[in-house]
């Protein structure tokens, strides 16, 4: 899926995804939403704005899928979600309630729909169309969460999760998710070392097609996926490609088939797609002589669909499991 860079568990669901790294213990076994409290909560969002809520936010909406994953992972089912069909295609780490209302696109939610939901808070990123945040704030508290930070992608994920947890009164669940992620990474790294795969060179990407043109999107060292690869001890092959630039938020680059020739010959080439999406590498490029001549193309691996590359700890644990299984 194309996540533009200019503007890119419930407890039960998490437990179901953690078999590969032996991290099925979930300290947050209660799927019920946090109880309402009369104590006000004051927090500071990504804008530096101080926001005071009457109590833990329960009736909430989110415009970006990372926030939706955070909420469900923390035991809070959002009542409003942008592009529900897309979310369920691209992120299967958590299960969204069928009662959720679609509030429009991620970049431009429907203000009319939001106004009908009687919300305690709306979580957004800074990628909304100009003026949208101010309009939403006329009726509902808005909490702005950064999309990412290529300087510290994993650290930003935790900061985001902690902000959402603070607003919803679910800090204990957030701590449990951090423990599960750390355990998954430690177990994964041990498994890779046992298999002799630690330190392998990996080029991870996705791709999208417009007409006859295929754009390949490298996930650099500053991407969330790149950060997890580094935690597992892999070498990011894209870091060796001269002149390849990455955006400062999501750590993503752009190249084409010709650009792949600059990757080290010993690279493992991994990529991801969405359920039901065209596979540019296996389909469109299957008879492309340049692609098929690359030493790693014959062994290119499509990881399991619907691991959301810009998600939270639930998605990243899925990625750890997939990476370990693929490399071992």
Model-identified regions with their sequence ranges:
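A short, structured surface patch at a secondary-structure boundary
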Residues: 59, 65-113
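Proline-aspartate-enriched helix->loop->beta-strand connector
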Residues: 114, 118-124, 260, 265-266
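Bacterial lipoprotein signal-peptidase II cleavage site
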Residues: 18-37
């Amino acid at each position: 899926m194309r996540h533009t860079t200019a503007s890119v568990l419930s407890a039960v669901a998490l437990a179901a995804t953690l078999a590969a790294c032996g991290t099925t213990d979930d300290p947050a076994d209660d799927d019920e939403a946090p109880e309402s409290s009369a104590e006000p909560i004051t927090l500071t969002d990504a804008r530096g704005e101080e926001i005071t809520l009457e109590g833990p936010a329960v009736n909430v909406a989110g415009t970006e899928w990372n926030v939706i994953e955070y909420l469900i992972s923390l035991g809070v089912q959002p009542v409003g979600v942008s592009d529900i069909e897309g979310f369920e295609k691209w992120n299967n780490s958590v299960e969204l309630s069928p009662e959720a209302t679609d509030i429009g696109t991620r970049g431009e939610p429907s203000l009319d729909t939001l106004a009908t939901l009687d919300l305690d808070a709306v979580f957004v990123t800074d990628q909304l169309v100009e003026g949208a945040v101010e309009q939403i704030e006329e009726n509902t508290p808005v909490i702005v969460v950064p999309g990412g930070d290529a300087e510290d992608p994993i650290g930003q994920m935790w900061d985001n999760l902690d902000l959402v947890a603070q607003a919803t009164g679910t800090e204990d669940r957030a701590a449990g998710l951090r423990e599960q992620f750390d355990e998954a990474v430690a177990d994964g790294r041990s498994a890779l070392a046992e298999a002799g795969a630690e330190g392998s060179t990996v080029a991870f990407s996705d791709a999208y097609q417009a007409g006859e043109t295929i754009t390949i999107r490298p996930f650099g060292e500053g991407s969330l996926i790149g950060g997890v690869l580094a935690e597992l001890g892999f070498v990011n092959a894209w870091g060796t490609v001269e002149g390849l630039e990455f955006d400062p938020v999501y750590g993503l680059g752009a190249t084409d088939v010709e650009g792949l020739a600059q990757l080290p010959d010993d690279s493992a080439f991994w990529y991801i797609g969405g359920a039901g999406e065209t596979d540019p590498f296996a389909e469109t490029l299957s008879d492309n002589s340049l692609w098929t001549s690359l030493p790693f193309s014959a062994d290119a691996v499509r990881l399991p669909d619907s691991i959301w590359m810009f998600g939270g700890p639930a998605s990243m644990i899925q990625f750890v499991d997939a990476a370990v299984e693929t490399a071992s």
